Amino acid sequence: MADEEIRHLVRIMNTDLQGKKPVKYALTGIRGIGLRTSRVIVDSTGIDPNAVIGYLSDEDIKKLDSTIDKFEEQLPKWMLNRQFDPLTGENKHLLGQDIILTLKEDLNDLKKSRAYRGLRHERGLKVRGQRTKSTGRRGSTIGVRKKK
């Protein structure tokens, strides 16, 4: 292991991961994979979770990549990040750029349907019922005028 060169950037799922981190922590650099999900992926591949990802062989990295592609079948329903998709009704686990695109799509659907949440997003106001009288103000402060 000492005579091998470390790869400082490892590319998995179109994401550059830091090569100096252990596998279980490096996988969390992919959007949609947290510690718990990365643990499930690493356990299913049989790779040591504490091994530094930069020292892994090409076969191990391909094994990780292919496992990430199909790991949502191994996860229980409650662990997926997109349960009962409004369009298809499926349970999915979104990764990478798909999360951002799906969120934008959902917000656009809310805006098109003129739902209350969509209108709040459109106007740049708070969405989840927070008070807005004194907090969440944007822009420069004008100040108070003194009486003459």
From Swiss-Prot:
One of its GO terms (biological process) is translation. Residues 128-148 are annotated as: Disordered. Keywords: Ribonucleoprotein, Ribosomal protein, RNA-binding, rRNA-binding. GO terms for molecular function: rRNA binding; structural constituent of ribosome. Belongs to the universal ribosomal protein uS13 family. Part of the 30S ribosomal subunit. Forms a loose heterodimer with protein S19. Forms two bridges to the 50S subunit in the 70S ribosome. This is Small ribosomal subunit protein uS13. The gene is rps13.
